[in-house]
Amino acid sequence: MGACLGACSLLSCASCLCGSAPCILCGCCPSTRNSTVSRLLFTSFLFLGVLVSIIMLSPGVESQLYKLPWVCEDRTQQPLVLQGPLDCGSLLGFRAVYRMCFATAAFFFFFMLLMICVRSSRDPRAAIQNGFWFFKFLILVGITVGAFYIPDGSFPKIWFYFGVVGSFLFILIQLILFVDFAHSWNQRWLCKAEECDSPAWYAGLFFFTFLFYLLSIAAVALMFVYYTESGACHEGKVFISLNLTFCVCVSIIAVLPKVQDAQPNSGLLQASVITLYTMFVTWSALSNVPDQKCNPHLPTKNGTGQVDLEDYSTVWWDAPSIVGLVIFILCTFFISLRSSDHRQVNSLMQTEECPAEMVQQQQVAVSDGRAYDNEQDGVTYSYSFFHFCLVLASLHVMMTLTNWYSPGETRKMISTWTSVWVKICASWAGLFLYLWTLVAPLLLPNRDFS
């Protein structure tokens, strides 16, 4: 009897994995929308790739792999071949990260193309989006195995520039998400203050606004101390000063009376969040400056105080990379878990709130202990755009894990000004986007920006 019950349980799990219903996760989250479950599972595939990349970057894994005589010879010699033209060096360091992230990006790019113009769950392709997870996992594994057989050649350099462009775009998406988060936060606390008639909510908004600006000022001071030097590091001084000036300007514009009249929910909380994020991007950019005098993250390799960049054989993680990875994880979850209550953000991110008619269906789903399909009359998010965001996320995490270092001609990682300029330009573009959200209702009064 026990064997029969076990077999039935296995068959049930198999039907969940191979069918069109996300049963396993729904069992853990019985009142979850079908669309949310699917996004979480796709995001888990991305995080699985990130975990594999982190493991392959670990120095301990590298040293243990080279100790196996049937895998690799001594690192000073030519590596052995594993069952075909696979260089075992591709299993290590930044080369493994490039290939793993190439696989995840290709996986999501395939689904981005496949899901173009899906309008509702009645489309047959919606069943593929929301189910068949076992086969999706097999596809991802197959692409990953194939990626590790890609010969080095010019692949790392070409893929580096793909990563630069994708990461630039994902930085802008992160800023949009921060704007939306701060907007929702500000709006809800103001509503609480009006409902409860309590000044504590206003005090909370003031405290966090003050805290974010205080952290931003501290970041500016620390960047001037550690990333600039008297008579040198002119680029760093200009970048810090310009971004500080731009942040002050957008903060002032956010509280102008005309802007407040057009957008009553705009305020210093959103501006403080954008200021703090801009300072982080600036810090991250300065950590890639290829000059040891202006970048304390670069170790000195010789007695002259100069850094021999070609001596870099491994990639280390600095503080900006760790913070960037945490922000990446939070923003990716943010994309997966919710739709915005801000119409402009919904339009830009191709999402929408759950329709009112879904409330009754949700209540029935909770009582029945199951997930419910909230996309019969129309999808709540663009499938293609969601996968496009995950493609950009794959490229961004690739650059984050490799510290934005460019692969050199001798299979080393080198720091370049390209990474610095891309991040600085991304910070400027992000500030411009935020500024546009403030002044657009004034410049285009005939359009609805509510």
Curated annotation (Swiss-Prot):
InterPro entries: TDE1/TMS
Compartments it resides in: Cell membrane
Principal localisation: membrane
GO term, biological process aspect, one: plasma membrane phospholipid scrambling
Membrane-crossing residue ranges in chain numbering: 5-27, 40-57, 96-118, 131-150, 160-182, 203-225, 238-257, 264-286, 315-337, 380-402, 417-439
Example of a GO cellular component annotation carried by this entry: plasma membrane
Alphabetized UniProt keyword annotations: Cell membrane, Membrane, Transmembrane, Transmembrane helix
Recorded catalytic activity of this chain's protein: a 1,2-diacyl-sn-glycero-3-phospho-L-serine(in) = a 1,2-diacyl-sn-glycero-3-phospho-L-serine(out); a 1,2-diacyl-sn-glycero-3-phosphocholine(in) = a 1,2-diacyl-sn-glycero-3-phosphocholine(out); a 1,2-diacyl-sn-glycero-3-phosphoethanolamine(in) = a 1,2-diacyl-sn-glycero-3-phosphoethanolamine(out)
Pfam families per the UniProt record, alphabetical: Serinc (PF03348)
Membrane topology summary: Multi-pass membrane protein
GO molecular function: phospholipid scramblase activity
Keyword Signal: no
Function per UniProt: Non-ATP-dependent, non-specific lipid transporter for phosphatidylserine, phosphatidylcholine, and phosphatidylethanolamine. Functions as a scramblase that flips lipids in both directions across the membrane. In contrast to SERINC3 and SERINC5, has no effect on gammaretrovirus particles infectivity.
Annotated protein name in UniProt: Serine incorporator 2
Organism name: Mus musculus (Mouse)
